[in-house]
From Swiss-Prot:
It holds the Pfam family RNA_pol_A_bac. NCBIfam families: PRK05182.1-2, PRK05182.2-3, PRK05182.2-5, rpoA. This is DNA-directed RNA polymerase subunit alpha. One of its GO terms (molecular function) is DNA binding. Homodimer. The RNAP catalytic core consists of 2 alpha, 1 beta, 1 beta' and 1 omega subunit. When a sigma factor is associated with the core the holoenzyme is formed, which can initiate transcription. It catalyses: RNA(n) + a ribonucleoside 5'-triphosphate = RNA(n+1) + diphosphate. Keywords: DNA-directed RNA polymerase, Nucleotidyltransferase, Transcription, Transferase. The keyword Nuclease does not apply.
Length: 376
């Protein structure tokens, strides 16, 4: 029987320190409805894994309010015209589908996610018509007289009045996910003349993702994930990404509950946490100055690796390409570097060191250290 009480130690995963949000070209710098998010570096393959999962969660998982039915004075069904109104009921229905309502169903709020009936009275007299040139447009803002809902597009025209009248209008608003046809919407207390609408609940309009190559130190075998998110304004792209991440985490937690060994990951070495002078003293050390087996020392010598700096800048896959360099030598070297608080594939760019100049830089730094010690 396996012992599940001890954690398993896994090699570190390269992870982004943060996700960068950028405005999309042509948006005027606004990120209210469109934004791109960049996450790098990610281990090879993780870009597509995360990108596809986030895209699906963004498209199907987010909730927002939408009008699911309406009733209006004198309207018996959706295939009729109304005297004094330019649009027939079919066009009014289409206009109501384009209404974008915004409200956060907070957990502690009185109504929460409950369906709400929003009633309004529209009164148009002769003076109103005269002021508008004979036709008065009734907008979404005119219909939201109660309920605490904001309108993303308050000037969206629902219908146009051409003669004095008074109308009683009731909108039924519900929260949901995705898209629901009128046939799938069931109203327990549906009114006799209440017309049920198709409802577009999802606030996300478009999601695309791209994966590019990026580098960590001298190793280019990593992913950069670029996620483009466009919403209709009921939530911002930043909110949409945060909400979808929580939805995925909720689903992944189901599988995490399996009674198996837990994994802990080695932490990446951060140069900022160490004194740079201390690190430089370690980097200029010769390979023969640390305690390695004869086999590992010979392997590094044959690869023309003379200093610790030349060793730690080398990506792990590249080391394994050298002749006679196997997993056993690799494991020994990694353990020794770990004791020194170093690791393979380190980014030494802040020291001005790259694969193309590491030898000469190590010699230069070694001479400076020796000169400093002599003067001291």
């Amino acid at each position: 029987m396996s012992d599940n009480s001890q954690n398993l130690l896994y090699d570190k995963f390269e992870l982004p320190e943060s996700v960068k949000m950028m405005a999309v070209e042509g948006s005027g710098g606004s990120v209210d409805k469109q934004a791109s998010f960049v996450a790098e570096p990610l281990e090879r393959g993780m870009g597509h894994t995360l990108g596809n999962a986030l895209r699906r969660a963004l498209l199907i998982g987010l909730e927002a309010p939408a009008i699911i039915s309406f009733s209006m004075t004198g309207v018996l069904h959706e295939y009729m015209a109304i005297e004094g109104i330019v649009e027939d009921v079919t066009n009014i229905v289409l206009n109501l589908k384009g209404a974008l309502l915004k409200k956060y169903p907070f957990q502690d709020s009185e109504d929460g996610r409950c369906t709400q009936l929003l009633k309004s009275t529209i009164s148009v007299d002769a003076s109103d018509l005269a002021a508008c040139g004979g036709q008065k447009s009734i907008t979404l803002a005119d219909l939201l007289q109660e309920g605490g809902f904001e309108s993303v597009n308050p000037d969206h025209v629902i219908f146009t009045v051409t003669q004095p009248m008074q109308l009683e209008i009731a909108l039924r608003v519900a929260f949901g996910r995705g898209y629901s046809t009128s046939e799938r919407i069931v109203l327990e207390d549906k009114g006799v003349n209440e017309i049920v609408l198709d409802a577009a609940f999802s606030p996300v309009v478009l999601v695309n993702y791209f994966v590019e190559d990026t580098r960590v130190g001298q190793d280019t075998d990593f992913d950069r994930l670029i996620l483009h998110v466009e919403t209709d304004g009921r939530v911002s792209p930043k909110e949409a990404l945060a909400f979808s991440t929580q939805i995925l985490t909720k689903h992944f937690s189901i599988f995490e509950k399996m009674d198996e060994k837990k994994i802990v990951f080695e932490e990446a070495i951060s140069i900022e946490k160490e004194n740079k002078d201390d690190i430089l003293h370690k980097l200029v050390l010769g390979i023969n100055e640390i305690e390695l087996s004869v086999r590992s020392t010979n392997c590094l010598s044959n690869a023309n690796i003379e200093t610790i700096g030349e060793l730690v800048i080398m990506p792990e896959p590249r080391l394994l390409q050298f002749r006679n360099f196997g997993k056993k030598s690799l494991c020994e070297i990694k353990n020794k570097l770990k004791e020194m608080k170093l690791e393979l594939g380190m980014d030494l760019s802040q020291f001005g060191v790259g694969l193309d100049n590491v030898k000469e830089k190590m010699k230069s730094y070694a001479e400076k250290i020796r000169s400093k010690n002599v003067k001291g």
